[in-house]
Swiss-Prot record:
Pfam families: Ribosomal_L27A. GO terms for molecular function: mRNA binding; structural constituent of ribosome. The gene is RPL27AB. Keywords: Ribonucleoprotein, Ribosomal protein. PROSITE patterns: RIBOSOMAL_L15 (PS00475). This is Large ribosomal subunit protein uL15y. The lineage of its organism: Eukaryota, Viridiplantae, Streptophyta, Embryophyta, Tracheophyta. GO terms for biological process: flower development; inflorescence development; post-embryonic development; translation. InterPro entries: Ribosomal_uL15, Ribosomal_uL15/eL18, Ribosomal_uL15/eL18_sf, Ribosomal_uL15_CS. Residues 1-38 are annotated as: Disordered.
Amino acid sequence: MATALKKNRKKRGHVSAGHGRIGKHRKHPGGRGNAGGMHHHRILFDKYHPGYFGKVGMRYFHKLRNKFFCPIVNLDKLWSLVPEDVKAKSSKDNVPLIDVTQHGFFKVLGKGHLPENKPFVVKAKLISKTAEKKIKEAGGAVVLTA
């Protein structure tokens, strides 16, 4: 009865079992770990880990992260910040005030459209030109805070 043997069982009894005569399947022929990344393993490092070696640009040593902290909100999300009861009461004469800093945003950007015939006053630390233009075109106003 013939049985299909695995490769390593087939090789048993043949001196070095397919692993050669000198190295005999020993130790670390290519070096350990990431050895040779700039030399004999360079092709693999470049192919599978591009950018692993080398430097880019300059580091900002004493960067104050809070100085650059500026969470943003787009125009199309502004109306969703208004509570439902305030939305119901709003009219041309009684427009809602949206203070974006109370919702955790500092800057208003101009992506998207505002709802038709629903002007409102936006209070923010920063605002882009396009956002300001769209809010004013819709009949609203912008208040900048410190």
